[in-house]
Amino acid sequence: MVHLKALASGTLFASLASSAVISRQAAASINDAFVAHGKKYFGTCSDQALLQNSQNEAIVRADFGQLTPENSMKWDALEPSQGSFSFAGADFLADYAKTNNKLVRGHTLVWHSQLPSWVQGITDKDTLTEVIKNHITTIMQRYKGQIYAWDVVNEIFDEDGTLRDSVFSQVLGEDFVRIAFETAREADPNAKLYINDYNLDSADYAKTKGMVSYVKKWLDAGVPIDGIVSLLPPRDEGLTSCTALTALASTGVSEVAVTELDIEGASSESYLEVVNACLDVSSCVGITVWGVSDKDSWRSSTSPLLFDSNYQAKDAYNAIIDAL
């Protein structure tokens, strides 16, 4: 079991607390340090506008080893009308990642939100099946060999662990999951295929138990699910990240990962707990924080990220670097 240096000691903790912002250690890369501990990446989300912001881009290039498109690969961005695809934003991110030697996590293929009305209005099983297959195949074949992993289905569970009510579950039942994963495997056999959801930060949650139960069943039925991604919560309160990741790994998937990580207040202790959890679970391949700077966060008022609104490294960033 690997553990980072604890922050419980009074001297170190007082030192961190004494400064609101500690200047970034120029020689350090949080990705390189994490990979040195046997992981694949420490990543962030981005898109064209953020990558064209010189301050943001410099940090992405120097510190992070993986990129997840924040919005440019969602259904409404890629296929706003049936059969009409718009790849400009997604191409920009994929090209940037290739040029700068970054892994890419494709996000996301099937999701109930940011879904065009033309998809939401489908009521026929055969029609929806073909729409899902065409959407996944077109996108994945375009980026075949460029995407390390895809979030194939996203946020499909309710808090009680049952399937969320969506056009996909209404029309196809749970079979939409099989359809999506089998289509994705055929489109790019080498990409890792993930199921992604939030509020999986405790093994005791009904949602976590539901995820574990369904994934075990789908794997037993031959559905090609490679991994589970946990969207850890945007708050600062007694996380139980390690036991939760262990529970997800127990399903039999080959990989688990943490994504969309932003913690309200960005305390060093909470960020270190998540990092330690991933280090302690051998199948956890990486962590993705949901943005670079608080300025650009969708939750900017809660200051949840590793860099402040002036693009300066915060205590949590430096604590991770120091500990790794």
Swiss-Prot record:
EC number(s) from the headed UniProt entry: 3.2.1.8
Ranges for domain GH10: 45-323
Recorded metabolic or biological pathway in which this protein acts: Glycan degradation; xylan degradation
Protein name: Probable endo-1,4-beta-xylanase F3
Taxonomic lineage of the native organism: Eukaryota, Fungi, Dikarya, Ascomycota, Pezizomycotina
Origin species: Aspergillus flavus (strain ATCC 200026 / FGSC A1120 / IAM 13836 / NRRL 3357 / JCM 12722 / SRRC 167)
SS bonds (residue pairs): C278-C284
Induction notes from the record: Expressed in presence of xylan and repressed by glucose.
GO biological process: xylan catabolic process
EC top class, as a word: hydrolase
GO CC, alphabetical: extracellular region
Catalytic activity: Endohydrolysis of (1->4)-beta-D-xylosidic linkages in xylans
Role played: Endo-1,4-beta-xylanase involved in the hydrolysis of xylan, a major structural heterogeneous polysaccharide found in plant biomass representing the second most abundant polysaccharide in the biosphere, after cellulose.
Pfam families: Glyco_hydro_10
